[in-house]
Amino acid sequence: VLVQIVVTNAKIKRGDVVYDGNSTLTTPDSGDTSGSRQTLVTGEACRRACLLLRDAMEYRTLEQLIGQEFYGEYYAKTNPLGSSVPNPVSHVAYGYATQMCVVDKETGLIKKMVAAHDVGKAINPLSCEGQIEGGVVMSMGYALTEKYPLDHGKPTAKYGMLGLFRANQIPEIKAIVID
């Protein structure tokens, strides 16, 4: 996703982008990675750095800028849980999702799930569809089949006995990305 953000915002070719994996030595702390949080936080910081690069390319070529660093920063400010401030902010982005299922009346099994999610800007729609499908399967398992027995906070069941859906048990899923 970050490469897509660079190509789109810096207006450079994909072949000119070298992706260097993250390192705690060179990467500032950007909080946890949950859901698509890093697409927002790291992505916005990346976009801001790209705008600086694009401005620099007005006067120099990309080759002349090799070795120069451009920094973008984005801080997703929220209030801690249980905060006493009026109208605390718990999230920096919100979405909306709705699901519909088609059930076989004879067997009681789900034949099809339709999930429509308003996600804001889907940077990688195919990946977004995959996240929706994964969320549907996890939700179905949580609601219908999964059991996670604990004894003093420790799991007591083997992984294969948790009631997770197997691939051949998953119904057709139609993911709709509302951008």
Q: Model-found features: residue ranges?
A:
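C-terminal catalytic domains of large/alpha subunits in multi-subunit enzymes
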Residues: 2-179
